[in-house]
Amino acid sequence: ELKHQLLRKYGGYLGGLRQEFSKRKKKGKLPKEARQKLLHWWELHYKWPYPSETEKMALAETTGLDPKQINNWFINQRKRHWKPA
């Protein structure tokens, strides 16, 4: 009985949450071509791998990724693979 009362009261809200969660993208690897383009930039700028905002926008456009994905890729790449001189 309590379950039914709660479902009646909050059912719409829960359905909305369920739908919202199902819309979210699943985590996964970036497309291979995008990774290759980012790695190419990385290799050319290894000594100082901090792209400017303009470079990030250009990379986002050429890779088809969001600027936030570009930003996160560089943060992770520097953390995992960059040893400043």
UniProtKB/Swiss-Prot annotation:
Q: Which InterPro entries match?
A: ELK_dom (IPR005539), HD (IPR001356), Homeobox_CS (IPR017970), Homeodomain-like_sf (IPR009057), KN_HD (IPR008422), TALE_homeobox (IPR050224)
Keywords carried by this UniProt record: DNA-binding, Homeobox, Nucleus
Regions crossing the membrane: none
Which tissue types show expression of this protein?
Strongly expressed in ear inflorescence primordia and shoot meristem. Weakly expressed in embryos. Absent from leaves.
GO MF, one term, reads: DNA-binding transcription factor activity, RNA polymerase II-specific
Q: Which residues form the ELK domain?
A: 1-21
Q: Which family does it belong to?
A: Belongs to the TALE/KNOX homeobox family.
UniProt source species:
Zea mays (Maize)
**One GO CC annotation, please?**
nucleus
What gene is behind this protein?
KNOX8
**Principal place where this protein is found?**
nucleus
Identification of the protein by name: Homeobox protein knotted-1-like 8
Q: Which residues bind DNA?
A: 22-85
Q: What does this protein do?
A: Probably binds to the DNA sequence 5'-TGAC-3'.
Cell compartment(s), UniProt: Nucleus
